[in-house]
């Protein structure tokens, strides 16, 4: 199974680019973040023409996640459990069927800036809820992938200029500790297991020529349960997408 995650930064604004990548890369399963549309405005038919089943958890203007699979999806969940008042569309989960089913979770973790505000508190609370939910799923002992835009820079090797991010929520000790807490449940960072080379970024800001100067960060991750990690054969970052016309500021993993 080839599984991809991509923060597309508005699926409708970049639909031509997104579809071109799907036609070329042809992942079996993909989770998308920041689709920035309600369910009814998601271009479902365009993906169905490429052979995908579609599940969407959208929101007007902001956030929004989707899951696309060449095989049917079962047990679909929209929204992260643990806070019924949370209306932000950041979580989607499904079991992708087939001879070797996989539970796939797509997340768009809160940015959290500025630190010291309710936005940072929400980020940490969201990560704690994710941790608790994953702990409930792990006893199922099934292949599980938690992929998406984590908005966390795990290690110094994952940022070109660490000093520029010291005051940012993505690089705070609390954010990084919460990411490690997920790993400490027994989850494997797919990129670190398959490659691990420094300087492999998934995001370059639109500002100040970040792409041209390779001033990037690695914040898009896939964490694998033991059963999924046993099946890991490789990881690739499609950094060439950042140079395409009208690109997202993220690239597919």
Identify what each model region corresponds to:
Residues 12-24:
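Short, acidic/polar
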Residues 1-10, 101-116, 147, 250:
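Active-site-proximal beta-strand elements of phosphoester/diester hydrolases
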Residues 81-82, 109-127, 163-168:
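Surface-exposed cleft-lining segments at the edges of enzyme active sites
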Residues 20-22, 90-99, 129-142:
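Short amphipathic alpha-helices and their capping/turn segments at secondary-structure boundaries
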Residues 24, 41, 76-83, 156-253:
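Metal-dependent phosphoester-hydrolase catalytic domains
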Residues 11-13, 37-41, 115, 153-154, ...:
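Active-site environment of divalent metal-dependent phosphoester hydrolases
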Residues 35-38, 42-114:
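Structured beta-strand-rich core segments of catalytic domains in phosphoester-bond hydrolases
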Residues 6-7, 22-40, 104, 133-156, ...:
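Active-site beta-strand/loop signature of hydrolases that rely on acidic residues for catalysis
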């Amino acid at each position: 199974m080839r599984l991809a995650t991509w923060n597309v930064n508005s699926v409708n604004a970049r639909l031509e680019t997104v579809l071109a990548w799907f036609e070329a890369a042809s992942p079996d399963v993909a989770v998308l973040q920041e689709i920035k549309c309600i369910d009814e405005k998601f271009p479902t038919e365009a993906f169905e023409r490429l052979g995908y089943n579609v599940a969407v958890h959208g929101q007007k203007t902001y956030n929004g996640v989707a899951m696309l699979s060449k095989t049917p999806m079962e047990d679909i969940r929209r929204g992260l459990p643990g806070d019924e008042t949370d209306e932000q569309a950041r979580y989607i989960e499904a079991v992708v069927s087939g001879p070797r089913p996989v539970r796939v979770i797509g997340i768009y973790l809160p940015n959290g800036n500025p630190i010291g505000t309710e936005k940072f508190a929400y980020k940490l609370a969201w990560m704690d809820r994710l941790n608790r939910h994953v702990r409930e799923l792990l006893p199922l002992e099934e292949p599980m992938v938690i992929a998406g835009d984590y908005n966390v820079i795990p290690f110094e090797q994952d940022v070109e200029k660490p000093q520029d991010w010291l005051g940012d929520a993505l690089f705070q000790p609390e954010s990084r500790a919460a990411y490690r807490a997920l790993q400490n449940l027994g989850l494997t960072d797919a990129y670190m297991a398959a490659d691990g080379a420094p300087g492999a970024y998934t995001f370059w800001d639109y500002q100040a020529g970040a792409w041209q100067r390779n001033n990037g960060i690695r914040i898009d991750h896939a964490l694998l349960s033991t059963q999924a990690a046993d099946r890991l054969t490789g990881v690739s970052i499609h950094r060439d997408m950042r140079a395409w016309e009208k690109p997202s500021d993220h690239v597919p993993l």
